[in-house]
Regions:
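C-terminal/domain-edge helix-coil "capping" segments
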Residues: 44-59, 79, 87-88, 116-121, ...
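Short, solvent-exposed, polar/charged sequence segments at loop or secondary-structure edges
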Residues: 86-129
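N-terminal secretory signal peptides that target proteins for export/translocation
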Residues: 1-22
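Secreted/luminal cysteine- and crosslink-motif detector
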Residues: 13, 27, 112-115
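Bacterial N-terminal signal peptides
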Residues: 25-37
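Bacterial Sec-dependent signal peptides at the C-terminal "C-region" and cleavage site
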Residues: 37-45
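Glycine- and acidic-residue-enriched helix-capping/strand-helix junction motifs
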Residues: 62-76
Length: 191
């Protein structure tokens, strides 16, 4: 029937004009498109993700030396971090193979910014490094650092304590840092 309101039709049958509901729906749709366009990154930042390093200050480390299970975990942490950053779409990973041997031979946390110089040499805008600090088999800490490759400035530093020297504790801690710090919206943004 003409003039009857149909929930799925928002054009007035008499005048053929938009009703106030239709205007509201259109303006909301346009607003959402605008907001998404404004907050969408202009490009994925290029990043060099270096392998995690172990800082072992435990008595066990002094007595027994390097543990193969911890070395394997460090490699897996690095792979998982790279994969998650790539999958996020916010970062474009740069191949660090040309500088990998030099990075492995350095203490990236104590080399006076060599990580940013290495990142710059492979064309990255950012350098990401990470450490696992082991106090004992019970008390460990994971850190991730994001630095600007051109200036060397630290853009973000994130840290989380973990309990237990197991695969599960290491990977859950990395997952938490990625979700709640590294890829969290507006983490570290000063307003």
């Amino acid at each position: 029937m003409i003039g009857e309101r149909n929930a799925s039709v928002y054009i007035c049958p008499m005048s053929g004009r938009f009703t106030s509901r239709m205007r509201l729906a259109c303006s909301l749709a346009v607003s959402w498109v605008f907001l998404l366009a404004v907050h969408a990154p202009t490009h994925a930042q290029t990043v060099a993700v270096f392998d995690f390093e172990l800082i072992d200050t435990s008595v066990e480390g002094e007595i027994r030396g390097v543990r193969s299970d911890e070395q394997a975990r460090l490699g897996q942490l690095s792979l998982q971090l790279r994969e998650r950053l790539k999958d996020s779409g916010r970062f474009s990973l740069v191949d660090i193979a040309p500088v990998a041997a030099e990075a492995r031979a350095s203490n990236l946390q104590g080399c006076g910014g060599c990580d940013t110089r290495l990142a710059g040499r492979v064309g990255a805008e950012l350098s990401i490094t990470g450490t696992v600090q082991k106090v004992s088999n019970l008390i460990l800490n994971m850190n991730i650092y994001v630095r600007d490759a051109s200036s060397g400035a630290t853009l973000a530093a994130m840290s989380a304590d973990m309990r237990g020297n197991t695969d599960e504790s290491w990977f859950r801690t990395l997952d938490w840092l990625i979700r709640n710090r590294l890829l969290a919206p507006d983490y570290g943004v000063r307003r």
